[in-house]
């Protein structure tokens, strides 16, 4: 059996010669350009720089593609939101052209008025030691009042000036963002407390006051007529 199991002695000599030839290759290479300039470069370093350059270009292209996709998706979301608002909320041309901007400005002013009314510095809370707020000041500067009152004033002003847009906004919010059971319960409580309670009670009080006023005026007129008749007689 031969001593050289995997290869013959000639093959081993050839491999050693190739390795020696590769080791003897120069690590710097000179090249003469067409302009007459001579460039000296290292082939391994040049190859490595080409690899880094290609990798950097690839990463740049990936980032540019991702950024383009993100811009396109953001633009589509903005366009969809604008179309959704125009279709469901801002669908009254008269209010959009004439009343929407003034109503928004006045609603913002009402919001800041609510912030002023609920500011503690306007109701005697000057310092920790010297505090003398009134009952109305305590009521208006409470946490629920500071949270609800500015929004309520802004909502009332916006509803009075642009009722169609305000109604569409409330209906869209209830339909698309709240559960149906919660909306039904909310409307039931609202009807029970406000429509059938406060509103109906205030209407009855106003009607009673109006009837009393008319009866009083009628009795005064009858008295004046009776006095005039007595004077004529």
From Swiss-Prot:
Cellular compartments annotated: Mitochondrion inner membrane
Keywords attached to this entry: Membrane, Mitochondrion, Mitochondrion inner membrane, Transmembrane, Transmembrane helix
Region (Disordered): 1-26
One cellular component (GO) term of this entry: mitochondrial inner membrane
Mitochondrial matrix side: 118-138
Superkingdom assignment: Eukaryota
Topology of this chain in the membrane: Multi-pass membrane protein
Compositionally skewed regions (Polar residues) per UniProt: 1-11
Mitochondrial intermembrane side: 1-98, 159-233
Biased composition (Basic and acidic residues): 13-24
Function noted in UniProt: Component of the MICOS complex, a large protein complex of the mitochondrial inner membrane that plays crucial roles in the maintenance of crista junctions, inner membrane architecture, and formation of contact sites to the outer membrane.
Family: Belongs to the apolipoprotein O/MICOS complex subunit Mic27 family.
Protein's name according to its UniProt entry: MICOS complex subunit MIC27
Lineage, top ranks: Eukaryota, Fungi, Dikarya, Ascomycota, Saccharomycotina
